[in-house]
Amino acid sequence: MYLARTRFLFFLASLACASIIGTAFYLQQTFGLDPCFLCLIQRAAIIACGVLALCAACHAPGPTGMRRYSLGFLLIALTGLVTAGAQVWLQTASADQLIPFITKLEHLLSLLSLDMCIDRLRSDAMFCAEITWTLFGISLPEWSLLAFTGLALLPLYPLFSEFSHWLATKDRARY
């Protein structure tokens, strides 16, 4: 029964991801909101979460496979969560906080021989720091942060319920 519930949750997650991407494209076309570099990473994470959730729902693996799908989903959702959190921080940080951050990031990219990324970083970091649109006083990166938080919580159910099944089996084996 638990695997059927998990498949249904992953199917709902894939629908949620599809609606999030649809909304992002709608806002881009309707309001002319061009995505910045961090927005594109978040979109890629949402698409990856949606595809992985749909695969988990359609594949119907056993407990080990569902655990693997859940861990992969959790890693992708946490990547999006960190990216959205970084963008929210960029939007709320003052110029005094942004300049040292960008300087350290430029230094890191120069150490990695990614000089072509430095010029793009200067323009994109400032572009990502702009608040271009809000709904109920919440900016788009904050909405993304909320969505990724929900998506990161979803795979915890199969992981913890599998852990509780394992503990129950261990207790029964003792007696």
UniProtKB/Swiss-Prot annotation:
Q: What is this protein called?
A: Disulfide bond formation protein B 2
| GO CC annotation | plasma membrane
Q: Which residues lie on this side of the membrane: Periplasmic?
A: 27-44, 86-142
What are the disulphide bonds in this sequence? C36-C39
Q: Which residues lie on this side of the membrane: Cytoplasmic?
A: 1-9, 62-68, 162-175
Q: Where in the cell is it found?
A: Cell inner membrane
Keywords noted in UniProt? Cell inner membrane, Cell membrane, Chaperone, Disulfide bond, Electron transport, Membrane, Oxidoreductase, Redox-active center, Transmembrane, Transmembrane helix, Transport
Q: State the superkingdom.
A: Bacteria
Q: Which family does it belong to?
A: Belongs to the DsbB family.
Which Pfam families does this entry report, sorted A to Z? DsbB (PF02600)
GO MF annotation list? electron transfer activity; protein-disulfide reductase activity
* Protein's membrane topology: Multi-pass membrane protein
Instruction: Give TM regions.
Output: 10-26, 45-61, 69-85, 143-161
Which SUPFAM superfamilies does the record associate with it?
Answer: DsbB-like (SSF158442)
Q: Does the keyword Chaperone apply?
A: yes
One of its GO biological process terms is: protein folding
Protein species of origin: Pseudomonas savastanoi pv. phaseolicola (strain 1448A / Race 6)
Chief location bin: membrane
InterPro entries, sorted: DiS_bond_form_DsbB/BdbC (IPR003752), Disulphide_bond_form_DsbB (IPR022920), DsbB (IPR050183), DsbB-like_sf (IPR023380)
